[in-house]
Amino acid sequence: PLSKKILLLDSSFSVNDIFPWGNEFSEGIDYEKFCAAFFIQPDLFLRLRPGNQERVITKLRQQEIVFETINESCIAVANSLKVDTIIELNKEAVIQDYSSQQVGKLLAQVKKENVFRVWDCCAASGGKSIMAKDILEDIDLTVSDIRESILYNLKQRFAEAGIKQYKSFVADLT
């Protein structure tokens, strides 16, 4: 555990030295836990793409991979797991932090009667764009980012995810 590892350090070290503004916290925040969290590797969250839930879970179980089911479309695995050696990344599941996946709750409330125009204006790795396509299905997708290299990587990820129809451009929206 982390507490034993910290004991191996110089006795003058305190985990509270990591974030010295504890007196600025709102009431109810555990200062010790907050500081210790900087030393804990977070889980890797996978958003399971529609129709792939059982397939991904079966593959993980066959490899005896420990995972936690967060909800019907999200599972958490160890961050050290080389997930791309077990599943078809971007086709069966997308690596996407849990907080970003919450956008899906809002998208799921939208009626799918029309073709929606979706602009992911700071696309980065495109996780929310892929989620919009999964939830809203037939969309007119536009993606932009300030970095051309990011859009190049995004093109590869979209190809893996089966997204062929979209527009992209470089833009600084600051």
Q: What spans do the regions from the language model cover?
A:
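S-adenosylmethionine
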Residues: 1-174
